[in-house]
């Protein structure tokens, strides 16, 4: 597969330029001229817009505008000038460059004070600082639209609101629009590192930092601030909460001041994550005890230094005593002690501290049935309620674990009535597909915002708590971990719907996710009603689909939690100290968090909420396994057993992912051709990866429980030919780890199998060796446990578990069976249905007399949802090599001459037209080449492709298992299907299986 253009390029064409004239000023700058002065001299001409403008890529609406096109401002502030520029630019593009109107027709911009001074007889309401009023006045020959703001920033918000309506084809008419944000803190957090990498970022490198300093070119930063301001976001925390001390050095602060200057024209104020140990690490003080007078003085001096450079600096974000980050607990101090020391330094400058409640012990004893990571935030912070300074906000994750596809609302929201709180959510899709999967997160966030905590028996929805309204707090808000980078902001065009939705919900949490999706689609893609319906439907169905084919019923993530957090590795969350356990065994699954028999977590909620979660019978099915350990035969509210729901959910979810491909194809010719071509392979990849998820989870629970799927699908693949059963030339059979990540636990590998012995980490320390203890399977054999050796995330920023933290397997635990041992077929026969060819297990002779696996054409039904399409499509990343050093890699995969491997299969089914799915592993560090031939001939151009996507994990794994489809293949009994492969560097052209599927249009 070739790289898409959007993957190869950084964001370019940041700013369209328009010629603008207004009385009294000869020319006004384009927004790209982000360093503003009192009189600015960078005039410019109209130019084409690019995809970098996202939802601000204004297109002609095809009809006369309902507002004047002459703009006048009453003030000369930086933000008012920005507002005027934005409005002129938007009107020009929306009108298709219609000449500016002459005469008295005007859009007038001003603050309340400025408007009152101009129109002393006009009654204007008192507006809050970020509140605006849009009103229209009509006379016989005149028309005036006033945008009045409680501040100059509010004027800018009013301008973006007017343009949002016009871009959607909504006429202003005689309407009066008055809006104010629901909460004061509306920030994005960037987890950017000084070297330019981004923790949990999936869109390339940082737009802020590179090689230990602030980037020279900050035009992307100005354009990002423009996007943020257009949805009402008013703050940006620039750097990673881990390893943050360097950002307080004088050289770095001078660079941060340049970033602040770039964002200032849009009213976006910057803040920094700080390391609580900075006084010791960079200040030369022997301690970082927050109550030490020298430490307090150091922080006060450092804050003064910052404000001398950045007068509108917002404050600090703190991660402490968590996941290896230092904190006040080192000195017997509390989070309140640390937060208040910082708050005292910031208070004279009106700065704030956002102290993250993400504090927990990642060395929990998994054998202890009372141990529970979910309890940590409440246990630590609830006793400190009322002890924090007034300018401290506790930043609480939406759920008690860590940005899962579904988890309950954090009980801490109801546990702090005398302390300001902000909700932390994640725009970057760490556990929800990493922007390789379409997952629109607004419905999830909306459920959290609307959830009623029932504090003291009264209605207290989370949105009111974080807005400061429930408990009469002046501060509060929402913080979104953004992860934007140089590749199309979030890496995938449709992922930008999440950034847009975050801003809109932070401004108005009463908006519906569907309403926001429609707004975004009209502004970004098309106002065509059919397009809006289709894209909105895709967005709204994407989160339920993802949850369905990954981890339903409150299982939390089943991703590889000690590695990439991406593909399935179910055992990785068990038997270690990280506390994301689902407690699955032969008899049942789920974590008992009840007060009566479990960890007591349920008791952290108010009584009105706790009573619903304490009993399995009253717990919503979608959270059942988060709160309760139940037998696989436990019946849900619809009468279906837990195990059957797990099977059905995955077999229902995968076809939903495939439907996104068909939905998108229906838009061809109706939307921008570049956007169409960019998204199609991404959606095809998702459809294929949904099958990988489906198979891994259903195989795992089939073997663990011993209870077959009532429909005979799990572990039974009648249309597949396994690569390890093919006639192989140069390929070698390997075990895949974890075993459920391959169709039957094995794959073939073109080159020597990698040495997976522990390798040194980048810092020179040793990575923990895999824990290969085993769990007993129902048939008495052993299930292989997860390989818990630490692997980097796609951006290389993974934090391996500390050496020695792994818990040993219990004495007497079963010895592991070979990883990838084949699964037996289900006990029940599969019902007769279609006449698709199925394997009969009989070897067919190849041309040289050796045996080939065959399809005999016996009548077997295709697995529900098996006819899915997929192809590789993802973003570049980095990772550890499976080889000890570059010399071993060169010897193994790049011997002299071209290395090639082949796998031959025989077809002995009914004649007809089919499509062939090839499931292979696309490893980092190279681009292996594959060719499918039929009887020695390549059937079409799709039958040759490159494995040139970059996916996590450097050895064959569900993270990089990828599906390629060759359509419209005529097969007859006796045909030979050959897969020829050429490895490249560290990509060994690993192959899992081929699957013969019914042809589709």
Cite the ranges covered by each PLM segment.
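Acidic, contiguous N-terminal accessory segments
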Residues: 48-138, 173
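Feature activates predominantly on carbohydrate-active enzymes
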Residues: 76-86, 90, 124-317, 347, ...
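Bacterial N-terminal signal peptides
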Residues: 31-43
